[in-house]
Amino acid sequence: MLKTIRKHGITLALFAAGSTGLTAAINQMTKTTIAEQASLQQKALFDQVLPAERYNNALAQSCYLVTAPELGKGEHRVYIAKQDDKPVAAVLEATAPDGYSGAIQLLVGADFNGTVLGTRVTEHHETPGLGDKIELRLSDWITHFAGKKISGADDAHWAVKKDGGDFDQFTGATITPRAVVNAVKRAGLYAQTLPAQLSQLPACGE
């Protein structure tokens, strides 16, 4: 009887140990898969705002944290694109604080000479059917920033047409596109200041 109990106890202990090990292995595999998927999604988003042929470094690993009013309140990530180890452009997180329904989060690609290479909205709460046309899945409006040059803080072209600029507003919704245009302009201007301050910026994760 005692031998049987001991035998069953050992079997249960081995089973428990095996189950724990299997669970840990599955959890680790799941974490790895999630991390890989997140990395692929991030790269796909980068490719939408910065042409891949313009750089040859690992963009996600060239990440810096900046606190700059031009990008919005708090810290924002900036990714420096390099060609043969020479900084050539940046992908910047930026916030348009003055959307119709609150802050609009953006990703802006820009070189250091004042040209915006691409823009995408990553988060917003704008009105469906009106301000949400800033989303690529609903309209190509957001793609019209690519290739646009900023000639300085007073560049009148960088405004919606209602304000005398070059960018369309939406029917029944001017506040949202105005907020995005202004935020992209600020980010593009800020990008020009990055080369001079790279050595002082903290890396992401520090």
UniProtKB/Swiss-Prot annotation:
Stored Pfam families: FMN_bind (PF04205)
Gene Ontology biological process terms in this record: electron transport chain
Protein family per UniProt: Belongs to the RnfG family.
Gene this protein is translated from: rsxG
Protein EC: 7.-.-.-
Name listed for the protein in its UniProt record: Ion-translocating oxidoreductase complex subunit G
PTM sites of type FMN phosphoryl threonine: T174
Molecular function GO terms recorded: electron transfer activity; FMN binding; oxidoreductase activity, acting on NAD(P)H
Subunit and partners: The complex is composed of six subunits: RsxA, RsxB, RsxC, RsxD, RsxE and RsxG.
Necessary cofactors: FMN
GO cellular component: cell outer membrane; oxidoreductase complex; plasma membrane; plasma membrane protein complex
Entry membrane topology: Single-pass membrane protein
